[in-house]
């Protein structure tokens, strides 16, 4: 089972999102979490590496909604991810 953590920046970004955007992210996150467990991401989430940021990945949760994350080490079974940023496409400038 995957575990997750968030950066302070992610939490600050989260507070700036509208209620609608938060709901959109939650829907996408449920799909992401299931796909992570299955070992394959569906194309609609467009999970891919962020250019110029080795080890950082992005997930699309709305037409202009992005969330960035990285894989981290943990003891035990399953992956551990750290959510770094969330917001518009602009977050990719400082993922």
Model-derived segments and spans:
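Arg/Lys-rich, positively charged N-terminal/basic patches that mediate binding to nucleic acids
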Residues: 1-30
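Secondary-structure boundary motif
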Residues: 16-19, 34, 38, 74
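Enriched for short, Lys/Arg-rich terminal
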Residues: 1, 12-15, 57-95
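Residue-level signal for pocket-adjacent positions within structured domains
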Residues: 5, 12, 40-45, 87
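Residues that form or immediately flank small-molecule/cofactor binding pockets and catalytic motifs
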Residues: 9, 52, 88
